[in-house]
Amino acid sequence: MAQADTAAVQQLLECDPVWAAYALADLQPAFAPVCAWTVGTDNVDRAVALVFTGLEMPTLFLSGPANAAADAVAQIPALPEQVYITVREEHVPVVDRHWDFSRDTRPMWRLALAADTALPHRETPGLMRLTAGDSDRLRALYRHGGPFTPDAFSPYQVDNGVFWGIADDDGALLAAGGTHIVNWELGVGAIGNMYTRPDSRGRGYAGVVLAAIVNTLRAGGVDNIVLNVDQRNEAARSIYEKDGFRIHCPYVEGIGVKRET
C-alpha cells in the first residue's frame, strides 16, 4: 500500500484504538520503511493487515471483521516464510490458512488504562529514568530469565519511548519496564518489557516502575495506554488491574511457518 494511503489506514484503525494501539504507533514516518499495509473488504466492511519487518521476525497484525481481514491478507504481495502474529481470536482461522502455528500459540489479554487515570507517584530508592545508554543493563536484567521474560527488547524502544528502572547500590537493575512503542503525536503508548529480578520479587517494584512509566506518558500527552499480558500470568494481570488497567479483549500471539502450497 502506498504511503499516501496511511490516512485511510488510520481512520480504520481508530475504529478500535485500544486493539490497534501498536499499529497506530507504527504510522509514524520513521517506521514507513518497515511497514507494509493492505486494506481488505468483504463488500460490506473493511479490515487492515500490517506486516512489520522492523524486528528479527516479521510480525502480522490484523484489525477488522474476519472476512475482510482474509481479503487484506490475500493482498499481501509476499507472505513471510515465518511470521509472528498479533490477532484477535476471530482472525485465527484466517492466518491458519497460510501458516502452521502448531508449535507456538499463546492466549493473551489486551489491557487498557482509562484516559483520565493517573497513578500515584511511588518514590523508591534506586528509581531512575533509563536511557539508550542503559541498554546493556536492561539486557543483563532480562538474562535472569524465567517464565514471561521480555523477549522483544530493542534499544530503539528506549530512544523513542519511556523506560524506568530500580537499581541496587552497585548500579545493577533489580526491576525495569518501559514501552514497546510510543506515538507522541497520536497520543498512543504500549507498555512492555516489564521484569523484576527473581531475587527481588515481592517488594512492589513492578508497581513502582509501572506508575513511573504511566505518569511520564501522561505528562507527554498520551491518553491511549495499553499493555499485553499472557493469560497464564495471573500475577502480572493482578498488578495491572490493581492500578486501574482493565481487559479490553482476548487475542492470540504465536509463531507460524508458511504452509506449502
Regions found by a protein language model. Name each.
Residues 86-92, 227-237, 254-260:
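Conserved beta-strand-loop-alpha-helix junction that forms the acyl-donor binding cleft
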Residues 11, 17-76, 177-188, 192:
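Conserved donor-binding loop and adjoining core beta-sheet/short helix segment
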Residues 17-36, 143-169:
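Active-site rim helix/loop that mediates acceptor-substrate recognition in acyltransferases
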Residues 66-77, 196, 202-219, 224, ...:
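Conserved acetyl-CoA-binding loop-helix of GNAT-fold acetyltransferases
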Residues 95-96, 240, 245:
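Conserved active-site tyrosine of GNAT-family acetyltransferases
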